[in-house]
Amino acid sequence: MEKGDTHILVFPFPSQGHINPLLQLSKRLIAKGIKVSLVTTLHVSNHLQLQGAYSNSVKIEVISDGSEDRLETDTMRQTLDRFRQKMTKNLEDFLQKAMVSSNPPKFILYDSTMPWVLEVAKEFGLDRAPFYTQSCALNSINYHVLHGQLKLPPETPTISLPSMPLLRPSDLPAYDFDPASTDTIIDLLTSQYSNIQDANLLFCNTFDKLEGEIIQWMETLGRPVKTVGPTVPSAYLDKRVENDKHYGLSLFKPNEDVCLKWLDSKPSGSVLYVSYGSLVEMGEEQLKELALGIKETGKFFLWVVRDTEAEKLPPNFVESVAEKGLVVSWCSQLEVLAHPSVGCFFTHCGWNSTLEALCLGVPVVAFPQWADQVTNAKFLEDVWKVGKRVKRNEQRLASKEEVRSCIWEVMEGERASEFKSNSMEWKKWAKEAVDEGGSSDKNIEEFVAMLKQT
C-alpha cells in the first residue's frame, strides 16, 4: 500500500451474511480509489476468495476473536462477552501499530452489531461509522425497543411507528427462537443504536426508493444517513465494477455447474427455487410438510437442503421427485436467481436474500423463521407487493396445503403477473440506485470525497 493512498479499515461481524455486504461496499470504494484493509478472524480469512484486482486491493488483517477459548457450556452472553473483550484488546493492539505506519487509516467502517468498535476508534482519533446490514425498518423497531417505546412481545394488537406501515405482533422480529438467550439477543441488536451520536455517519444496506420514508426518520436521529445498497455484486446490477460476479466469501461449497446445467434444460419462468439460508434449522415435521407441499405443486424445483437437514426429508423423497426436482446441498444463489428459468423464490427472507430477490426481479413466497426475517416478509408482501407470505396454524406449522397454495398463487394465480411486474420494477430501481448518479452511488461518491479532503 503506497504512502499517501486514502486508507480505511472495514470491520465486519465474522459471519457470511454480515461480511459479504461490507465486502461489496469495499469493492465499490476500491473502484473509486480508496485502499481498504479488512479486519477479520482467521476462520473467515481462510474462506475468502477475492478475485482479480480485489485479491491485491483488499489487505486482510487477521485478529483473534477468542473462539479458541470457548467452552461448550458457555451461554450466548458469555460467548459474546468474550468475543467483545478479546476483539477490543486485539483491535487496540492492531491500531497501535497501524496508526504509526507509513499510511495510517483515516476511517473505520464497522458492523453495527459491534458498537464497542466506536469507542476504540475514539481512543485513536479515528473517524468512524456503523454499517447496518439489515433493513431500516428493523433499525426503527430496534431503536424504539432500546428507548422503551416498544416492548417485545408487544402489549397491543397493532403497533404504530414513525414512517412505518401499521404492524401486527406477527410482523415484529422474532427474537425468542432460543428462549434462554432472548434477552441477550435483544440487548445485542438494540445496542447498535446506543452510541450513534458519536458516529460521523450511519451507513445502511438499502436504497432510497425502497425505504425512503424510514430513511428520512433515521435522519432525525442526528447523524447523516448514507444508503449504499443494494450490496449485490455489480455484474447483476450496474456492471460498473470490474470482475464483480461473486461476493468473495462462501462458507459452503456450491454445486454451481450441476444447478445451472439443470436450469438450462427448463422453460423460462418455470422453476421454483427453494432456500432458507445458511443458519435456519427446520423441525422434521415442518420440513416434511414443506417437501410434500412443493412436490404437490407439480412444478419444477431446485431446492437447497444443507447436509445437516437432508436426513429430515421424507423417506425416498429425492428419488420420488427426480423428474421434477433437483435437491442440492448448496448453490450460487445469485447465479440461480439470475437464470431465466427461475420464476419464484421460496425464501426465509433474510435481508441479503430479500435484496437479491428484488435486484433480480424474482417474485417470492415468504417463509420467515425468526429475527428480522418476519419483518422482511411483511414488507415483501404488503409494501413492495412481490409475493405471498406463508401462514402458520396455531401449532406454528405451515401445512403442505398452505405451502402448495402460496406457490401456486405466486406462479400461476390471478396476481402472478402483478407480482412479476412489481418485481421487475424493483429490479430497475435497484440498478438505478447504484448506477452512475443514482442515490447510493452519490452517497458513496460523497463519502469518498470526504475521505480525500480530510
Swiss-Prot record:
Note on file? Mogrosides, the major active constituents of S.grosvenorii fruits, are a mixture of cucurbitane-type triterpenoid glycosides that have been proven to be powerful and zero-caloric sweeteners and can hence be used as a sucrose substitute for diabetic and obese patients.
Tell me which residues bind an anthocyanidin. 18, 144, 371
Q: What is this protein called?
A: Mogroside I-E synthase
Q: Which residues form the active site?
A: 18, 111
Please report any disulfide bonds recorded for this protein chain, giving both cysteine positions. 259-331
The entry describes the temperature dependence as follows: Optimum temperature is 50 degrees Celsius.
Membrane spanning segments where? Answer: none
Question: Looking at the keywords, is Glycosyltransferase present?
Answer: yes
UniProt-recorded Gene Ontology molecular function terms = quercetin 3-O-glucosyltransferase activity; quercetin 7-O-glucosyltransferase activity; UDP-glucosyltransferase activity
Q: Note the superkingdom of the native organism.
A: Eukaryota
Activity-regulation annotation: Activity is increased by Mg(2+).
Tell me the gene name.
UGT74AC1
Pathway field: Secondary metabolite biosynthesis; terpenoid biosynthesis
According to its UniProt entry, what is the function of this protein? UDP-glycosyltransferase involved in the biosynthesis of cucurbitacin and mogroside tetracyclic triterpene natural products (e.g. siamenoside I and mogrosides IV, V and VI). Cucurbitacins have cytotoxic properties and exhibit deterrent taste as a defense barrier against herbivores. Mogrosides are nonsugar highly oxygenated compounds used as high-intensity zero-calorie sweeteners; they also possess pharmacological properties such as regulating immunity, lowering blood sugar and lipid levels, protecting the liver, and acting as antioxidants and antitumor agents.
Q: Which InterPro entries match?
A: UDP_glucos_trans, UDP_glycos_trans_CS
Q: What is its EC number?
A: 2.4.1.350
Q: Specify the effect of residue 109 to I.
A: In UGTMG1; increases catalytic efficiency more than 10000-fold for the 3-OH glycosylation of mogrol, and acquired ability to convert the generated mogroside I-E to mogroside II-E via 24-OH glycosylation
